[in-house]
UniProtKB/Swiss-Prot annotation:
Stretch forming the signal peptide: none
Name the UniProt record assigns to this protein: Putative double-stranded DNA mimic protein VC_1208
InterPro entries (alphabetical): dsDNA_mimic_put, Put_dsDNA_mimic_sf
Gene3D superfamilies: dsDNA mimic, putative
């Protein structure tokens, strides 16, 4: 197996994919809100891989190879990313490119 992609590069890649796909997967109001507030409140952060991904993707997720990135807006009062626009499962193996996104639904 190749050396895993760094955490920072994984987050950057996830964010780039999010920006490309957001207009087709989020409500227009959410795209406008995210774009307008990202500079002040936006975040893309790596979190522990959720146990629900196995059911979502149909295979057993290796938590050493895959990462979960959450993208959204941080609550200014408590500095918590609580308005999540997307959860992404992304492979950190450069030879095994994969991502799966769960989008915010109102």
């Amino acid at each position: 197996m190749a050396e895993l992609i760094s955490i920072d590069d994984t987050i950057d890649t996830a964010y780039d994919i999010f920006l490309e796909m957001a207009p087709d997967n989020l409500e227009p109001a959410d795209v406008i809100l995210f774009t307008a507030q990202f500079d002040d409140r936006g975040a893309a952060e790596l979190v522990d891989v959720g146990d629900d991904w196995d059911d979502q993707v149909g295979f057993e997720v290796d938590k050493e190879i895959y990462a979960e990135v959450r993208i959204g807006l941080v609550n200014e009062e408590n500095d918590v990313l609580d308005d999540v626009f997307a959860r992404m499962l992304i492979s950190r193996d450069p030879d095994q490119k994969f991502c799966h996104m769960l989008w915010k639904r109102d």
